[in-house]
UniProtKB/Swiss-Prot annotation:
Its EC number is 2.1.1.-. It is an enzyme of class 2 (transferase). One of its GO terms (biological process) is box C/D sno(s)RNA 3'-end processing. It comes from the Archaea. Keywords: Methyltransferase, RNA-binding, rRNA processing, Transferase, tRNA processing. It comes from Pyrobaculum aerophilum (strain ATCC 51768 / DSM 7523 / JCM 9630 / CIP 104966 / NBRC 100827 / IM2). This is Fibrillarin-like rRNA/tRNA 2'-O-methyltransferase. The keyword Repeat does not apply. S-adenosyl-L-methionine binds at T91, T92, E110, F111, D137, A138, D157, V158, A159, Q160. Belongs to the methyltransferase superfamily. Fibrillarin family. NCBIfam families: PRK04266.1-1, PRK04266.1-2, PRK04266.1-3. Involved in pre-rRNA and tRNA processing. Utilizes the methyl donor S-adenosyl-L-methionine to catalyze the site-specific 2'-hydroxyl methylation of ribose moieties in rRNA and tRNA. Site specificity is provided by a guide RNA that base pairs with the substrate. Methylation occurs at a characteristic distance from the sequence involved in base pairing with the guide RNA.
Amino acid sequence: MSIEVVEVKPHERHYGVYVVKFEDGTERIATKNLTPGRRVYGERLIKWGGDEYREWNPYRSKLAAAILNGLKLVPIKEGTHILYLGAASGTTPSHISDIVGENGLIYSVEFSPRVFREFMEKLVDQGRRNVVPILGDARFPYQYAHYVKGVDVVYIDVAQPAQAKILADNADYFLKPGGHVMLVIKAMSIDVTAPATETFKQEINTLKERGFDILETVHLEPYDTAHAMVIAKKR
């Protein structure tokens, strides 16, 4: 038996994010579905006021986890152009696709051919025309420089060492003046022996050394352990 929705309202802080309230008092966040009737990762579809919303699962998306943990700044709105490094099978990119809408664009880089095929099936083949799929290695931005034009945001979520360096290298290529970067730090992918807080500090220092001002840092527990989201802006 499904629980009835009693209200859907815009998030008080974040453009394109909605808060769904259910009759049992629980709340979830969601985005307005750019491709109504279609799911990406088995998420719940919610109809309200003539629109359809996709529930945004914080256990499947680091950005959703950061928002629920109080992230104040998400530099993504309608029409934003984004370079997304580590697109995987498309969970978070699909919600960003909803937010940026038809006038936005997401250049989505994924290294694994198998996962890339899954990304294509779930997003591109399902009609998300604001997604540009790129099979490539985020460590070498020159390999896809001919595909990507200047972007407003570079977002990275990769399970590799030197995550901040990879982000900064891509920002040097593609980030417009005044643009933002969003770094998901996966501490265990960098150093399994060091405390996560030390790894976070190390990656943040790398961004500072590369000319970024750190605007906000949010830890992602309980949704993901030893993870943090960092928002920064190029000086």
